[in-house]
Structure formats: structure tokens, C-alpha cells
Amino acid sequence: MAIEKYFIPDFVELQRRSFQRFLETGLIEELNKRNPITNSQKDLEILLYPEYYKLAPPRWNSLDAILLSKTYSCRLYVPAQLTNRKTKQIMFKWVQLGDIPLMSKRGHFVVNGAARVIINQIVRGPGLYFSEIQYNVDSSKKTLVRRYAAEFISMRGTWLRLSIDKEKMIWAELKKTPKIPLVWFLLGMGLTEKILFQSLTQPKRLLYNYLDYLKIDNLAIDVKSQNDAFAKRALLRELLLKSKLNSSNIKTLKNSKDFKPLLLVNDIYSEMHSYKEKENRRYPLNSQNGDLADEKEKIPYYANSSLKALELIYSKITNTKKITNLNKKFFAKQGQKWIFKKFMNPRTYDLGLHGRLSLNKKLSLSLPLSQRTLTMYDVLVATEHLLRVEQGLLGTDDIDNLKNRRVRTSSDLIQMQIGIGLLRLEKNIRSKFTTIKGVPKINYFFSTKPLNGALKEFFGTNPLSQFMDMINPLAEMTHKRRLTTLGPGGVSRDTATMDIRGIHPTHYGRICPVETPEGKNAGLVNALTTFARVNPEGLIETPFYKVYKGQVQKKAGFFYLSAEKEEKAIIAAGDLNLSKTGFLPKGLIPVRKFDEFTKVLRNYVDFMSVSPLQMISVATSLVPFLEHDDANRALMGANMQRQAVPLVRSEQAIVGTGIETRIASDSGHVIRAKAGGLVGYVSGQKIRIYTFVSNF
């Protein structure tokens, strides 16, 4: 233990590294999303150059900001170019967009003189997830039917859900919008019928939505032609079928078991004819009124083209039942706008880089990573996967598995808020485009209020921005390493189930199973473990030693594994006695493979844990003899240490675990030298250190 404490990573690294990532890439990425800004006539254009942005030195340091009740921030300047195509003029100038709050060395922000910490939020990662839905068939609620759903989750924009209901109909669902038949949605996104029905192994399933309208008991598609539909029974109650026969040959076909008519559906699925089983003559069905349908009349419930699908989608979401010839074009255009705005506009819908990576991997697609919006092929292939999940050929996703969850660090949350501020700035600029007179200057269009207002809202009112817990150094440390599932875009403490609150096998080495609050927030607010880190994708990783033929390769360093990479690995415990040459003990060794504990020979081991402290958090690792504690008492002990009043004069713990020094050092409450060396002089004003390192 005495040696291992020096390999423990910096405890505040998560906060500092995430903010560094925001300054290096996140800010530039967010500014590029609003580039360029043009007016409606396209003759005025403002272009920003985010790669060359500059931050002016802050007016106060973090300590002075606290004393003066100011914000520790710096001014953000970006070069901007205004192009006037009417006068063929180009103006260039540096403009101030706003003030960016800076993070201190200790990993917190100073806003209006108060130290604030941004909590790390753990949410479902962007991508595609398959889940199971259970429906009650009867009123007794004893008979359950299992159905499945596919859900597209985006970083920004509307979530889309493809669900199969208990009648086996497939629907496209959005929040606050009536559900739409999947055929309409796919055709509305631009797919043709030929591609649609040839790409799916079960094209008949897309027609199940129309059985209710046609009142057919069962419908099946002939695989060879994909154009012939068979009905087991002859009764088609409210459907009007047309006939090109003479009136003398017309007979009324009634519901009878003797007749099994063939319903011929042509390529646009709009004309149907009925046949008698043993005769070649055509028998059109009468409607309930006894009238035959007009030859030009078509079944209004099936869309035979993208244009028709767009009309139906818009009429569905606006609850407009009747579509006349006058407003057909308007409806189609509005439906097209609606689909584009919801899923195909990069300004309103964004899967993110990791969302596109996840989608390509799950659906075996090769779309470019720059394609951050949803495409028709994403939805089409997801439909095919959903049908395979229903057949049992593919499995559903475990949403509690950490491979399906992402951590939103402070950089991600600030970047999202800056995106909101830049959107407001863009709207301001567009409104000023309409009111300008004469030759405008660049400064006329820009204001610091939109960006500053958005950041002020975030730091002041967002539940993830909290006053720093300053009871003692440990309280500060754990506050900066906290993970929560609450907050905007997360779960609600009132509706959270035990599955969300429980401990998952993938939590090992990533989320502490002990440290969590008591009460309503139990299991929803957690702590990062001692050795864990968050990679740029937002996945929590934990280190292991590689084991090669039974020998632990300590000199090779740590191998950080995410939950997905660890799934198939066989991992040995970190407290095994090794030989002098680094070999694991002979005989059977207790190991873990995902959620199973078993024993194997050392040659089968892939990795070894780096320390017994790996599975617990910083606060829990301060509890002496933790292995002898009851779990509930250990939880209370870990929490109550944060409430301890600090000593006026620091003392070493009588009973300690060995990492107290690191916690005090990383908290920033002690004086730290830039490099190690020999102390040569100490006074009330300075400490002089002689070091062997020349440049530091």
C-alpha cells in the first residue's frame, strides 16, 4: 500500500482536463456550428474564424475575485468578416463575444465572489438503443405481451422512437406529437417504395398499420413478387374497391368461408381487385351502402410516394383530417419542412461525433463522421434490426451498463450553454439585418449580452452548478468528483426505479458502490472511484495490468479499459501475492468475467486489478478496516467524514489508510512546490527549495 499511493492519479484532473478540452476544441466546435450567418436575401454574410480566437488576461485572479465579489473570467475575442455582396465590400475586425468564466487550479469557478463546482452528469449516450415493452392483453393484467422498440437518442434535438405495439404495428413516435405509421415516415424522409420494400426481410410488417382501416383479419405478402396480398377472409367492410367490369357482370360478394379472394395490390398499393377462388371473373365488393367506388378514388390511408407521405404526416401532426386538392401542395411542403427541421437540420438536430460512431458501429453503416444528423438509411436499417430483435436474432440493450452511458463533464455542459448563447446571438444578428440603413459596421451586429446572459443563467440557476462544499478539504475533493443522474436531461428522483439506483457489474473500478447519499438521492448521486478517469468520449475507464502467460506486466504500465472493452476479459483481483518475477500463484485463481465470479488457471487471466482501492472512492478509501464494516455503516462513515470540522493545526491521523497526504496535497489547501528538492530555508514569507531539476 505504501508504494501504490504514489501511482494514484491527480484527484482533480477530471475537472481541469475537461476544461482544457473545452478551450482547445469545444469552443471552436460550437462557434463553427453558427457559421456563416446570412440574411434572407443572401447578400449580407458574417463569417467568424473560431480557430484564431483569443482570450484576454483576466482582470482579477481567483483569490482577488473572491475578495472583490467578482467573476474570475476573461474576455473572448473572435475575428469576424462582414461581406456585402451588393456593394462588394468586405470588412474585417476582432469582435468581443462575451466573458468566459475560467477554472481555477483547484478545479472550481469563481462567480460573483462565490466558489462554484459543476457536477459531472451521467446520462444515456447518443446513439440507438433497443428495449423491450410489455403490454397487458386482458383487464386482469395477468397476460403480458412482449414487444420491442428502437430509440434514437441525440445530443441536441428530438428523440425518435420506433415502436411495435401489441397489434404488431410499427410506429414512429416523438414527444408531444401523434404517432405516425413508419411507412409514412420512411417515405417522407425520401426513400422510394422500391428501396423500402426490397431492403426489409419482412416488408409485410409495414402494412400492418392499415389492417385496422381495411378491417382485414390477416395479411401476408408473397415473398416472390412483394406485390400480392392475400386475405384469409373475404370481408372488407368499409373499403371501396373499383372494378373495370361491365355492370352486367357485377355480383355482390358476401362474407363466406367458401370464398378466399385474392387481393391484387399494384406497385402503388392503391388499387385492389377481388377474385373468386375457382373462377376467373372479378367480383367487386360493395360498400355498406351498396355503392361501388369511383374508379379514380384511392385508399386514403396508404402513401404511394414521398409527396403523399409528407401530406399525411403533416395532416396527422396538425390533426387535420381532410386533405383537399387546394391544400395538398401546402401540406406536402409543410411536412417536408417538419421532417427537415426535426431530424435533418444540423442547427436543430445533432447526434454528435460519438453518437454517429455508435450508430455506424451498431448498424454496420459506413456513413461519414461529419454526418451528424439522422438519415433515411439510419431509420431503414434500424427498422430491419428492430424486426430481428423481435425474432430473437438480436438482443436488447442494457441501459444501466456503463458502455451505454456517457459522462457530461463541465466542458460539455458549458459548451452546450455557449451553444444556446450563440443561437441567441445569431437571432439578434438576423433581426438587425432587417433594420440596417446605409453601410453597417461589424460592431453594430455583435453584443456580449446573449452569451453572457446564457452563462449567467447556467452558473446561477442550473442544478448542476452548485456552491462548493468547503467544510474541509475532503468535502471539496468529493464534490468535484461527484457523478449524478439528476438534472436537465437526466432522471427524476421521484420516478427513478431500483434498476437505475442499483449497483451494476460494470461499476467495478468506475463508480463507488459505497459512497452515495441517504434518502431520495440514494443511488442517483455517486462518486468516481480512486483510479477512474473519463476519456474524451465521456466513457469511464479504469486501469489494469496486462497479464501475459501468467506474468503480470507491471513495467508495461496501466491499460485503461472502458466497460465495453472489459466485457470479455478475465480479470484477477489486485491483492494477489505475486512471485519475485511477477508471476501469479499456481493453481486456481479467483477471477471475474463481467458478472460471473469463478476460478481459473493463471494462463487464462487477461488482466489484473492495480490495487484493492480501485473499486472504492476517495472518501471511502479513508475508512480504516473497510472490509470489516457493514455496508450501511461504511456508507455513513464515508459521508460523515465530509462533515468533519478541520483542525487549526494539521496532524497526522492516528489510524490512517495511507492516502491522507495525497488528498491534502491535491485539494490545493497546502503549499505545493513546482518541483521536488531539499528545503534550505523556511520563514513566515517564503520557503526556499534546492532542486536538481533545471527547467520546470
From Swiss-Prot:
Its EC number is 2.7.7.6. Keywords: Chloroplast, DNA-directed RNA polymerase, Nucleotidyltransferase, Plastid, Transcription, Transferase. GO terms for biological process: DNA-templated transcription. It catalyses: RNA(n) + a ribonucleoside 5'-triphosphate = RNA(n+1) + diphosphate. Pfam families: RNA_pol_Rpb2_2, RNA_pol_Rpb2_3, RNA_pol_Rpb2_45. GO terms for cellular component: chloroplast; DNA-directed RNA polymerase complex; mitochondrion. Disulfide bonds: none annotated. GO terms for molecular function: DNA binding; DNA-directed RNA polymerase activity; ribonucleoside binding. InterPro entries: DNA-dir_RNA_pol_bsu_ext_1_sf, DNA-dir_RNA_pol_bsu_external_1, DNA-dir_RNA_pol_su2, RNA_pol_Rpb2_2, RNA_pol_Rpb2_2_sf, RNA_pol_Rpb2_3. SUPFAM superfamilies: beta and beta-prime subunits of DNA dependent RNA-polymerase (SSF64484). It is found in: Plastid, Chloroplast. In plastids the minimal PEP RNA polymerase catalytic core is composed of four subunits: alpha, beta, beta', and beta''. When a (nuclear-encoded) sigma factor is associated with the core the holoenzyme is formed, which can initiate transcription. In S.helveticum the gene for this protein is split in two. PANTHER family: DNA-DIRECTED RNA POLYMERASE I SUBUNIT 2. Belongs to the RNA polymerase beta chain family. DNA-dependent RNA polymerase catalyzes the transcription of DNA into RNA using the four ribonucleoside triphosphates as substrates. This is DNA-directed RNA polymerase subunit beta N-terminal section. It comes from Stigeoclonium helveticum (Green alga).
